[in-house]
């Protein structure tokens, strides 16, 4: 059964992804396998009784897109390398950091959520459109027609916000609903607006978990926009222990944990060396545990390592956590010159996992430690690619370095606006 699992300070619980009152796991599985809304009759979409289904479908689309996004970013950054011989597949282009708007290296844009490779543009665009379409319909319907309209509005706005956030982090530019090309900053501004709406609606509906999810999301986009004080203000409201996760299942390709699939079933992704034996002051960091599978990638001599974080096809994946919020606060404190506050946050996180304390009053050392903490705490959670951009981290291997599968490494850390937009969008031209 697929579920969303928000966690509070003292409790952990699951809610049904479609937000409907179902009486059996089979009923939920049937609904998760429902036809894509694009193939559902228009009169069904316009029926207020289906509001929960529409919002749940949008959330389901985002759940699938999330692991695709994380995988793509892991290849582009230093978390993953390609394990097997893909015959020129898109995995290679991700790892080599070489993309073009069209052709074979544009599979990031043309593949859907059921594809083998981690696709980005179409899955995230679909999730965003579904959430915004649900929002539009909820605005047209009244509370009498949809008794839980306010809570559904909070959910739709929150996942529209997250879809936009990941689009802004992944893409060099993107278009929405055949509109003009938007820069990442413009996309982040739209995401901030959606999160604000989600926070307000969640407050009115008493949906604490969705409100905290949206606060972490708004803090994330505000950090991306350079609004660190505002980001910290949001993050400070997130309670200790909060986590919002998706569960996955082996029901079909769209419900699988793609990270597990690529590392352990297909052997197409291997944890890169910097993460295989990550340690702080000589002590292994339990937040980043990599397992030597004792195998080599298909058709290669590349050693295969997998993240212990995702041991099965059902392994949950975090969308937002208290730990992420704390690191946002630490970054804002460092930016404001409150060095000890940042250090204190690191040490709270260290204490929770049994690591030695960090100590420094040197801003450069504290910044380096912040980068380390984000690498460890947010390992394979979809944050690394944007951190490369925000912190201007060196690309490893460096551009121009010979690539195992031929050619050399490139320097692209975002995906270009795809050719499909130039061909089909009247508001975009070359």
What positions do the PLM features span?
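Conserved, well-structured interaction surfaces
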Residues: 52, 91-170, 197-205, 313-317, ...
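Short coil/turn linking the two alpha-helices of tandem helical-hairpin repeats
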Residues: 166-176, 206, 224-227, 337
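Hydrophobic-face positions in mid-chain alpha helices that act as interaction patches
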Residues: 91, 100, 105, 192, ...
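Membrane-proximal, proline-rich intrinsically disordered regions
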Residues: 25-78, 396-430
């Amino acid at each position: 059964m697929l579920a969303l699992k928000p966690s509070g300070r003292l409790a952990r619980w699951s809610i049904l992804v479609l937000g409907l009152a179902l009486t059996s796991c089979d009923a939920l599985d049937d609904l998760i396998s429902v036809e894509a809304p694009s193939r559902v009759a228009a009169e069904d979409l316009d029926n207020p009784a289906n509001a929960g289904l529409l919002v749940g479908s949008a959330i389901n689309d985002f759940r699938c897109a999330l692991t695709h996004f994380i995988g793509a970013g892991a290849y582009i950054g230093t978390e993953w390398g390609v394990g097997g011989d893909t015959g020129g597949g898109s995995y290679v282009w991700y790892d080599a950091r070489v993309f073009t708007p069209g052709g074979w290296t544009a599979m990031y844009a043309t593949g859907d959520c059921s594809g083998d490779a981690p696709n980005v543009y179409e899955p995230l665009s679909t999730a965003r459109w579904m959430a915004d379409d649900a929002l539009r319909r909820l605005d047209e319907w009244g509370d009498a027609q949809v008794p839980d309209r306010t809570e559904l509005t909070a959910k739709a706005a929150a996942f529209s916000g997250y879809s936009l956030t990941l689009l802004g982090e992944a893409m060099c530019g993107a278009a929405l609903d055949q509109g003009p090309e938007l820069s990442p900053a413009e996309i982040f501004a739209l995401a901030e607006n959606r999160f604000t709406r989600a926070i307000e609606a969640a407050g009115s509906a008493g949906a604490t978990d969705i409100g905290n999810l949206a606060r972490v999301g708004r803090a994330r986009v505000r950090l991306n926009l350079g609004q660190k004080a505002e980001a910290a203000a949001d993050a400070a409201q997130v309670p200790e222990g909060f986590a919002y996760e998706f569960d996955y299942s082996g029901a079909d390709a769209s419900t699988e944990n793609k990270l597990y699939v690529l590392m352990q079933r297909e052997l197409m992704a291997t944890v890169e060396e910097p993460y295989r034996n990550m340690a702080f002051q000589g002590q292994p960091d339990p937040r980043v545990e990599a397992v030597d599978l004792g195998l080599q990638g298909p058709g290669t001599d590349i050693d295969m390592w997998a993240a212990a974080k995702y041991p099965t096809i059902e392994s949950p994946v975090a969308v937002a956590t208290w730990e992420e919020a704390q690191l946002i606060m630490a970054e804002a404190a460092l930016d404001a010159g409150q060095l000890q506050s940042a250090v204190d946050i690191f040490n709270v996180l260290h204490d929770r996992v049994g690591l030695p304390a960090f100590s420094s009053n040197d801003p450069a050392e504290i910044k380096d430690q912040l980068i380390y903490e984000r690498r460890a705490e947010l390992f394979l959670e979809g944050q690394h690619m944007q951190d490369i951009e925000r912190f201007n981290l060196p690309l490893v291997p460096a551009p121009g370095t010979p690539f195992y599968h031929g050619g050399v490494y490139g320097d692209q850390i975002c995906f270009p606006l795809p050719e499909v937009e130039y061909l089909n969008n009247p508001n975009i031209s070359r």
